[in-house]
């Protein structure tokens, strides 16, 4: 009886993941929600370099650590800049990569997040490096992972950045993190996207709070 129940549970888990097509590379488009800002009440901000400093590992023990389907030491920075997660089988084993669409990168997505955050705070986005307010960004984490469960799957996403802002000659550095978890029944694009969208939304809330506390 117990063996029958276990076999059924394993079969259901396999079917759930199979319905998500976890084999091979998955392409996952991501968007940043936009809301009406306050207008340019605080002037213009120039956003300079957005750098990817995520650390990838070969066969990490935790799914929350970035990895690829292959040898990370042989991957170029350009290839890694597109990877945002790994798929898993019903036992938690790593499968194919999850990547942004061709020609998109974590730097592009993060820049859009930072721009949206500044707009909501009342800044216009400028192109002059000599602007009174300027910012640079270092991406520490931009990753999603999945944890299989008996009756549902947990999709988690984490976006963490170091933000350096210089305003009127004064420089401050902050860490901003957005995190979210989404429970779903199948490893499909919408479930991955819901996790990322919620993490983006949380990031923007934390961004607003961080700048407010800094008087920016």
Language-model regions, residue ranges each:
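Bacterial N-terminal signal peptides that target proteins for export
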Residues: 1-9
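Sec/Tat-exported extracytoplasmic proteins
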Residues: 54, 110, 114-122, 143-146, ...
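A structural "domain/chain start" motif
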Residues: 21-108, 212-216
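Surface-exposed short loop/turn segments
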Residues: 25-30, 116, 120-171
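Short secondary-structure boundary motifs at beta->alpha junctions and helix caps
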Residues: 80-101, 168-215
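Generic short beta-strand segments
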Residues: 50-54, 138-144, 177-181
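Bacterial N-terminal signal peptides
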Residues: 9-18
């Amino acid at each position: 009886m117990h063996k029958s129940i276990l076999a059924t549970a394993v079969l259901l888990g396999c079917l759930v993941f199979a319905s998500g097509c976890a084999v091979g590379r998955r392409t996952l488009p991501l968007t940043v929600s936009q809301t009406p800002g306050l207008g340019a009440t605080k002037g213009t901000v120039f956003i300079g370099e957005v750098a990817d400093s995520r650390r990838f590992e070969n066969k990490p023990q935790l799914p929350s650590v970035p990895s690829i389907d292959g040898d990370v030491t042989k991957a170029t920075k350009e290839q890694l800049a597109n990877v945002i997660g790994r798929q898993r089988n019903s036992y938690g084993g790593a499968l194919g990569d999850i990547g942004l669409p061709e020609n998109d990168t974590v730097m592009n997505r993060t820049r859009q997040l930072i721009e949206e955050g500044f707009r909501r705070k009342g800044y216009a986005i400028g192109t002059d490096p000599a602007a009174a307010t300027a910012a640079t960004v270092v991406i520490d984490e931009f990753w999603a992972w999945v944890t299989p469960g008996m009756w549902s799957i947990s999709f988690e996403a984490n976006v963490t950045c170091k933000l350096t802002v210089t305003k009127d000659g004064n420089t401050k550095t902050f860490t901003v993190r957005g995190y979210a978890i989404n429970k779903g029944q199948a490893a499909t694009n919408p479930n991955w996207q819901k996790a990322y969208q919620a993490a983006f939304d949380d990031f923007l809330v934390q961004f607003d709070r961080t700048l407010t506390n800094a008087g920016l």
